[in-house]
């Protein structure tokens, strides 16, 4: 599975995790109250609640960063082994007297040869930040401008590019104002940010003190030096993207109020099928206001307008406003005004340009957006793929070779998934794709002509796997795909572009109607059942927070039914079974657990003839259930149930023994 698909699935899952822990109604209420302009002075009660803390654990436990240690060397694996009570007490104690640990800073290489700083807070601080984020996000989402697309739920770079294209294609705004904020994340003014949070209605003083401490957490550089920041938000912190949007939200609305949301005596509003609100600008056109629209993705933004004169005035005003109002430094070299009819403008790894496309109804020249993968992005992609080809060449055995090929394919699919919305992507990648294929031909072992059974580099082969990301390429009848070790290697230029889709404003994770457009609500499992499971965790013996969290997930995934019999589970008669015994692996992962009836659990571990017969008679299992049961028995070290001795129409699945009798 490629990286973009994994991210999308993770986001979809996060949207429903709040339902698992009964927090969705709380977040919905915060969103409604924020929309109504209410003030929030007692948020810490929600932030430190049991369900919010456990939801925070679930949201971060599978993030790749959770396995990256900070200064204290603790990773998620340490916390997984704690009991639920231990985790809750630890978090509550840290909130009561919060002092952030040092943030470990690493320098990450950039494509231009420079580096950017990445802060790695301790895992305890990440959990604290996640608890806060979950509560602040619905409040802030209600106040954020609709033209902001970065680091927000159910918004993406595709929506930003679609909006930029719309400004060119439909609004006919051909001048773009680019103002580059120099080192934005390192320059955010703490005092200004605290005031902005207060203005948004976040007025819980205990929470604001904690947020100030998070911003001022000491940073440990790679050489061991400790730095105490006076400005900026740590890149890598869970709260940083939200705080960045809070800081620039004031700027979004300032631009918006110049034209798009400017108040006039008469309002001519309308709403289209997608839920987007628009208005007839006839009243605005009678004023001296200058038409302008912002499209922002975190700190990267474009301001579209109609004339160079307007663009020059906006350019100066924006620089002055950002420097004086937000105390943010501007990079003069990277800031400019662009006429899209004559020059390209880079945005989020794409280049935008307006090209002639026929005539309008009144005979005027019509312009349409032409988008490409930016030269910088192409160069970076080519370098990374070329490096991966070398890794494939140097693999010591076929098993590792296939893994490296899979990684190469994942990189190709990731590039395609992100850049497929460019109108001319195929042309952009054609030359680079053939250069990479030539490199493969020179580096990989060759095959004999027309040899379909070779392990060498060849155009002949057949993919028999089930990876949907690969299947969609192999189904196409084209000349692009090559094979090595009988594994397909995708071609960079084998891509089909699609039109970027605008964000539907009706999609909203904090309204019931909006969530229906994201995913189906949990219908097979009631909130009463989930509440019982949350209120009755397994606390005795070796039960961990990971065990209880996965127990809840499995109940939803199995629709509240036994994984062997398929019958509805009785919550008082349910067992959460380790497929491979805990004493062997100490593994409480989701993959190693399953929910079953207590009698099925006894039957999995039973070795005595009388016990097995009695349980089989009581359960009356069918053939499919026996197959599932046998798989679980084999995993715990027991034999499959003997077909002849029990006079049952069953067979032993997957693993057979020389002597199967239990008696």
Regions found by a protein language model. Give the residues of each.
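Active-site and adjacent loop segments of nucleotide-processing enzymes
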Residues: 1-29, 308, 325, 348-553, ...
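Active-site-adjacent bridging/hinge elements
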Residues: 99-111, 212-229, 387, 406-411, ...
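Conserved polymerase palm-domain catalytic core
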Residues: 87, 95, 102, 143-147, ...
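Polybasic, low-complexity binding patches
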Residues: 583-591, 603-643
């Amino acid at each position: 599975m490629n990286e973009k698909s994994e991210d999308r699935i993770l986001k979809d899952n996060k949207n429903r995790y709040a339902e698992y822990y009964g927090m969705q109604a709380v977040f919905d209420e915060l969103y409604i109250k924020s929309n109504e302009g209410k003030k929030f002075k007692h948020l810490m009660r929600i932030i430190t609640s049991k369900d919010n803390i456990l939801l925070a654990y679930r949201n971060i436990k599978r993030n790749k960063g959770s396995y990256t240690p900070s200064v204290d060397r603790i990773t998620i694996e340490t916390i997984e082994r704690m009991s639920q009570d231990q985790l809750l007490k630890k978090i509550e104690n840290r909130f009561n007297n919060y002092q952030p640990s040092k943030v470990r800073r690493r320098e990450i290489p950039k494509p231009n040869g420079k580096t950017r700083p990445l802060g790695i807070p301790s895992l305890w601080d990440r959990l604290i930040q996640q608890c806060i984020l979950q509560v602040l996000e619905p409040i802030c989402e209600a106040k954020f401008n609709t033209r902001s697309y970065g680091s927000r739920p159910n918004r993406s770079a595709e929506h930003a590019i679609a909006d930029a294209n719309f400004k060119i294609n439909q609004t006919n705004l051909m001048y773009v104002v680019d103002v580059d904020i120099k080192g934005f994340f390192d320059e955010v003014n703490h005092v200004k940010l605290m005031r902005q949070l207060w203005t948004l209605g976040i007025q819980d003083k205990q929470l604001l003190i904690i947020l100030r401490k998070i911003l001022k957490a000491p940073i440990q550089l790679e050489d061991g030096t400790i730095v105490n920041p006076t400005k900026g938000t740590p890149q890598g912190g869970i709260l940083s993207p939200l705080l960045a949007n809070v800081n620039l939200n004031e700027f979004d609305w300032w631009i918006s109020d110049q034209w798009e949301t400017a108040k006039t005596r008469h309002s001519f509003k309308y709403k289209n099928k997608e839920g987007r609100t628009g208005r007839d600008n006839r009243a605005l056109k009678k004023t001296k206001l200058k038409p302008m629209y912002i499209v922002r993705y975190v700190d990267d933004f474009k301001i579209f307008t109609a004339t160079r004169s307007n663009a020059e005035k906006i350019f100066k005003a924006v620089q002055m406003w950002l420097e004086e109002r937000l105390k943010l430094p501007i990079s003069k070299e990277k800031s400019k005004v662009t006429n899209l009819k004559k020059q390209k403008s880079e945005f989020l790894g794409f280049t935008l340009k307006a090209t002639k496309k026929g005539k309008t109804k009144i005979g005027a020249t019509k312009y349409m957006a032409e988008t490409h993968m930016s030269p910088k992005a192409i160069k970076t992609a080519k370098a990374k793929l070329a490096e991966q080809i070398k890794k494939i060449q140097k693999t010591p055995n076929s098993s590792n070779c296939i893994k490296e090929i899979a990684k190469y394919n994942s990189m190709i699919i990731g590039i395609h998934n992100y850049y497929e919305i460019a109108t001319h992507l195929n042309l952009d990648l054609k030359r680079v794709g053939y250069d990479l294929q030539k490199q493969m031909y020179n580096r990989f072992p060759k095959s004999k002509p027309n040899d379909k059974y070779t392990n060498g580099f060849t155009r002949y082969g057949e993919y028999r796997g089930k990876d949907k990301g690969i299947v969609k390429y192999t189904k196409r009848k084209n000349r692009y795909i090559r094979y090595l070790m009988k594994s397909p290697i995708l071609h960079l230029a084998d891509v089909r572009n699609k039109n970027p889709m605008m964000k539907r404003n009706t999609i909203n994770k904090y309204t019931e109607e909006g969530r229906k457009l994201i995913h189906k609500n949990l219908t097979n499992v009631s909130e009463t059942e989930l509440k019982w499971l949350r209120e009755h965790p397994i606390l005795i013996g070796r039960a961990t927070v990971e065990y209880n969290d996965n127990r809840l997930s499995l109940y939803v995934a199995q629709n509240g039914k036994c994984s062997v019999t398929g019958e509805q589970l009785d919550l008082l008669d349910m067992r959460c079974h380790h497929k491979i015994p805990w004493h062997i692996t100490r593994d409480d992962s989701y993959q190693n657990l399953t929910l079953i009836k207590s009698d099925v659990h006894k039957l999995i571990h039973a070795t005595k003839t009388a016990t097995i017969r009695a349980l089989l008679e009581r359960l009356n299992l069918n053939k499919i259930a026996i197959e599932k049961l046998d798989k679980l028995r084999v995993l715990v070290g027991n034999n499959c149930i003997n077909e002849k001795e029990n006079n049952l129409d069953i067979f032993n699945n997957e693993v057979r023994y020389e002597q199967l009798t239990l008696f």
